[in-house]
Swiss-Prot record:
Protein's recorded name: Enoyl-CoA hydratase AFT6-1
Protein family (similarity comment): Belongs to the enoyl-CoA hydratase/isomerase family.
Organism: Alternaria alternata
Note from the entry: Gene clusters encoding host-selective toxins (HSTs) are localized on conditionally dispensable chromosomes (CDCs), also called supernumerary chromosomes, where they are present in multiple copies. The CDCs are not essential for saprophytic growth but controls host-selective pathogenicity.
Gene: AFT6-1
Keyword Lyase part of the UniProt annotation: yes
Length: 298
């Protein structure tokens, strides 16, 4: 059985067509897709999962201007690739991300740097793929934003989150809206004003961290279990879940009309649901969507 990727209604970029051209082998991605290594990052793809590793451990995986631009390009590229279902972001070494690279000149290119960071967080926030932050260590400033702009976040118990900008006469200008959105006004304001370390256990209790692992090995297990669960989520349906969440969160436009458009499209002939429901009726309740026959054709 096959289904078409043609859509019957015009949707926004959050609702990409279902993926195809599945790549089943784990590998560094080829130069024809993206550079597998860059100045501060590495990229690995296995089946429908892309892993982006921040690889500036000597700088705490700090966000240089060039790294911010490269990450923006990666997320924009993967947003349009049918073979990508999920994007995992993590760090190499002790830190997840120590925020903006303060070793660079901040004042001469302030506007350029601000726009680059806004583009980065905007690209992750608008990405139709499921994004997962695997927080392997402490996060500061913009690194906190990187974690909490992602859809799902898991962390090691020894990590913490610190909005330390105020100590240097700065504030988390580019990430504040994501922190306030995910943490809530009260906690976000306190964290920004005091620069206190916020520990993962507290954020897990609030539901904004979705798992806390005891150590690095346990974090690997938690991550793989999560990715295994996500493998049963249909890619277009997942993108629609994100679009509906964004529509409700932003409170703009007619949500009911938007939901009706999605409903009509998701049950149309040639949709993911046609295949999924047919499999369910045959007694197959879990579909590994990367391996589904319908995804190999258009």
């Amino acid at each position: 059985m096959t289904y078409s990727t043609t859509k019957s209604v015009a949707m926004n970029p959050d609702e990409d067509a279902p993926p195809s051209d599945i790549n089943s082998s784990g590998r560094l991605m080829s130069h024809s897709e993206v550079e597998p290594r860059g100045n501060g990052y590495e990229v690995l793809q296995q089946a429908g999962t892309v892993r982006i590793l921040l690889s500036r451990p000597e700088r705490g995986n700090a966000l240089s201007l060039s790294l911010a631009r490269d990450l923006t390009r990666l997320f924009q590229t993967f947003s349009a690739q049918h073979s990508v279902h999920r994007i995992v972001l993590t760090g190499k070494g002790k830190y997840f991300c120590s925020g903006m690279d303060l070793g660079e000149e901040l004042y001469e290119d302030a506007t350029e740097r601000c726009l680059a960071l806004q583009d980065l967080f905007g690209a992750i926030d608008a990405c139709p793929k499921t994004t997962v932050a695997v927080i392997n260590g402490p996060a500061f400033g913009g690194g906190v934003g990187l974690a909490f702009v992602c859809d799902i976040r898991v962390a090691v118990s020894t990590s913490f989150f610190c909005l330390s900008e105020v100590k240097l006469g700065l504030c988390p200008a580019t990430v504040s809206r994501f922190i306030i959105r995910e943490w809530g006004v009260s906690l976000a304001r306190m964290a920004m004003l005091t620069a206190r370390k916020i520990h993962p256990q507290a954020l897990q209790e609030m539901g904004v961290l979705h798992a806390v692992a005891l150590d690095e090995e346990a974090l690997k297990v938690v991550t793989e279990n999560l990715l295994d669960d996500l493998g049963f989520a249909a890619p277009q349906a997942s993108a629609w879940c994100k679009a509906l969440t964004r529509k409700t969160r932003n409170g703009n436009g007619d949500h009911d009309q938007f939901a009706r458009q999605i409903f009509e499209t998701m049950v149309a002939p040639g949709s993911e649901s046609e295949y999924g429901v047919a499999q369910f009726r045959r007694g197959r309740k879990n579909i590994r969507w990367e391996q589904a026959e319908c995804l190999h054709t258009r």
